[in-house]
A protein has these predicted regions:
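Disordered, acidic Ser/Thr/Pro-rich linker "stalks" and the adjacent N-terminal cap
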Residues: 1-98, 110
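Trp- and acidic/polar-enriched beta-sheet ligand-binding modules for extracellular glycan
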Residues: 13-16, 24-25, 29, 39, ...
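Helix-boundary capping/turn motifs
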Residues: 97-100, 161
Length: 191
């Protein structure tokens, strides 16, 4: 079991970015369908942060982008800049071994904006003391990320969530570009 108590996460499967780069969660050990992952753990929890250059192949395995899971905001409305009609946020639901008292969550995000990749523009975090089907507390944490237009390095986006308790955390990550890429997620919590 992981030190932060995550026992599973559920989310949409990553997507292909051209013929050479697959941004899938290749190591996911739960139920895998063509478009959705549930009941397991994978690359978002493997302890490996992806390189800023998502095409980097550190072990020469032929898998460019291997350390990243990515999703495309491919609607025509998004390309035209119509925020109201963009793809819905990427929803990741994390399940923990027991009820925890959280202090922060870290998302290692890519920000290679010259390639249409940015960290999420907003994250909304919901907490539940029960399973994902039990419903969430009424006060989510809303975090607005300040867009970085200068530095293209991948970075940890750290969201403070002091004194929030839960056994399930739902993170809705909102697109700020054509692509959203995450390579690692880490929670800080106590019991």
């Amino acid at each position: 079991m992981r030190a932060d108590g995550v026992v599973a996460y559920n989310m949409p499967q990553g997507e292909e970015r051209g013929p050479e780069v697959d941004l899938f969660d290749f190591t996911y050990d739960g139920k895998v369908t063509e478009t959705y992952l549930s009941g397991g753990l994978g690359q978002l929890m493997d302890g490996v942060e992806g390189n800023s250059n998502f095409r980097f192949d550190p072990d020469n395995s032929g898998r460019k982008g291997y350390d990243w899971v990515g999703w495309r905001n491919d609607s025509a409305a998004a390309a035209a800049g119509d925020v109201r009609r963009r793809r819905p946020p990427i929803r990741i639901v994390f399940q923990f071994d027991r009820v925890r008292n959280f202090s922060a969550v870290w998302f290692h995000s890519n920000n290679l904006f010259s390639k249409d990749i940015r960290a999420f523009r907003k994250a909304v975090l919901y907490f539940s003391v029960g399973p994902p089907t039990a419903g969430y507390q009424s006060r989510p944490v809303v975090y607005e990320y300040m867009r970085d237009r200068v530095i293209e390095f991948a970075r940890n986006v750290i969201i403070p969530i002091p004194h929030r308790i839960g056994r399930t955390v739902r993170a809705d990550l909102y697109f700020d570009a054509k692509w959203l890429m995450i390579s690692e997620v880490r929670f800080e919590s106590g019991t």
